[in-house]
């Protein structure tokens, strides 16, 4: 497919060109200061790209520029894709959000919840109920990440060899069985904790469909949508377009760091963070959701299913700050933001720290990639770079503020 291109003048799409120039200048300054290698930003109204800027370099050492067809590791932006894969199976009646996960993955039978202790002295009790598919979709299953360091169960993940998402050398099936052997942090459905749950969903797709996750996504999502640059590895022909990955240094600069092993099909197919993609493909996926399940005559999901995916599912209508299970979730940026089936959802714009319309949904990746859909404004936005920050940064709130300032109708 051709690279993403601008399709309509900003003014004709209800956007202020001068405000968009300020947006570009803001992030170009970060490139000049050595805080970003380069970036791509795209803003679309009504499905047509009204602003597209590619600036800086995708590989600083090699002097290669960011272009419209640059490829990016989108990491956790994989999660909404995995959710769509699950929902296609739900629509076909092959599983339900209410199904116990152990119906398909027996290792999740008889889950146990952490009570106390550390190491070999951990005390657990039987969970009051099963882990259900819907708990995985909403990150309320009680799973975690090993790189967190605020709960004893986090340490148990690290001790089991899964500090990130996978034990070295393991495949998806082996890794998911390992997750199931570890205690839950809390009773399923009672708290929110961002976790490895989408990897479990990826394995669920494999078991229910009888296909490897990469094959299922290629045949059922990427192929029908024309997302030819999205997958779990890059081909020889694509490799030259892949951006270098950087990490943030102590002084706020950047330095190259190892990234996903994308050359050749990976042994571990991560439904949480394994995809590489392009701006064109991300735009296609966002438009599929904005148009409630259909794009260019291809329907992947029913409108009601997309509506279900993109509404808040946290118990009692809570937001992430109220239901979050750890101090990291108790942040002002989580006020007024709920969680759907793989995406965050704005449920109270008056309480969010970044200007967003009611019902705006989307998700981000650890290398500072993000997309969102504001259905009330027929707006989709994406921002791509490749920097893993040491801590929270201002890219996302700055981007939301600057896009909001550009909206004139």
Which residues fall in each region the model found?
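Short, surface-exposed loop or secondary-structure junction motifs
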Residues: 3, 110-355
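Short, conserved catalytic-motif segment at the N-terminal edge
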Residues: 11-74, 96, 110-122, 393, ...
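Short, conserved phosphate/pyrophosphate- and ester-handling motifs at nucleotide-, phospho-/glycolipid
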Residues: 16, 79, 278
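Active-site SXXK
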Residues: 21-27, 47, 73-101, 198-206, ...
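Short, well-ordered beta-strand elements
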Residues: 50, 371-372, 378-387
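A generic structural motif
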Residues: 56-58, 261, 387
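Acidic helix-start/capping segments at beta-turn-to-alpha-helix junctions
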Residues: 102-110
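Short, surface-exposed beta-strand/loop micro-motifs that present aromatic residues
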Residues: 362, 367-376
């Amino acid at each position: 497919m051709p690279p993403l291109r601008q399709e309509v003048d900003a003014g004709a799409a209800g956007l202020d060109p001068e405000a968009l120039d300020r947006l570009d200048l803001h992030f170009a300054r970060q490139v000049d200061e050595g805080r970003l290698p380069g970036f791509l930003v795209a803003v679309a109204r009504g499905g047509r790209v009204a602003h597209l800027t590619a600036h800086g370099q995708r590989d600083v050492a090699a002097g290669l520029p960011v272009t419209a067809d640059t490829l990016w590791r989108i990491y956790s932006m994989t999660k909404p894709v995995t959710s769509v894969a699950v929902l296609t199976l739900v629509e076909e009646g092959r599983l339900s959000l209410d199904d116990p996960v152990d119906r398909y993955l027996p290792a999740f039978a008889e889950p146990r919840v952490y009570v106390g202790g550390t190491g070999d002295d951990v005390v657990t009790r039987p969970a009051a109920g099963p882990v259900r598919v819907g708990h995985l979709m909403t990150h309320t299953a009680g799973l975690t990440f090993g790189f967190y360091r605020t709960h004893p169960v986090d340490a148990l993940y690290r001790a089991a060899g899964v500090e990130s998402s996978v034990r070295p050398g393991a495949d998806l099936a082996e890794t998911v069985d390992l997750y199931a052997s570890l205690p839950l942090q809390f009773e399923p459905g009672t708290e929110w904790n961002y976790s490895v749950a989408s990897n479990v969903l990826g394995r669920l797709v494999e078991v229910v469909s009888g296909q490897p996750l990469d094959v299922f996504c290629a045949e059922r999502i990427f192929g029908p949508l024309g997302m030819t640059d999205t997958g779990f590895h890059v081909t020889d022909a694509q490799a030259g377009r892949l951006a270098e990955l950087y990490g943030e240094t102590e002084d706020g600069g950047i330095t190259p760091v190892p990234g996903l092993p994308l050359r050749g099909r990976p042994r571990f197919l991560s439904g949480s963070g394994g995809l590489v993609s392009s701006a064109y493909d991300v735009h296609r996926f966002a438009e599929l959701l904005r148009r409630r399940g259909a794009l260019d005559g291809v329907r992947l999901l029913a409108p009601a299913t997309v509506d279900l995916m993109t509404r808040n599912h946290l118990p009692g209508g809570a937001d992430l700050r109220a239901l979050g299970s750890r101090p990291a979730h108790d942040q002002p940026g989580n006020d007024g933001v709920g969680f759907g089936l793989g995406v965050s959802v704005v449920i109270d714009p008056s309480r969010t720290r970044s200007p967003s319309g009611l019902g705006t949904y989307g998700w981000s990746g650890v290398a500072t990639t993000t997309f969102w859909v504001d259905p009330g404004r027929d707006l989709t936005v994406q921002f791509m770079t490749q920097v893993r920050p040491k801590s929270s940064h201002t890219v996302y709130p700055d981007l939301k503020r600057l896009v909001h300032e550009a909206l004139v109708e």
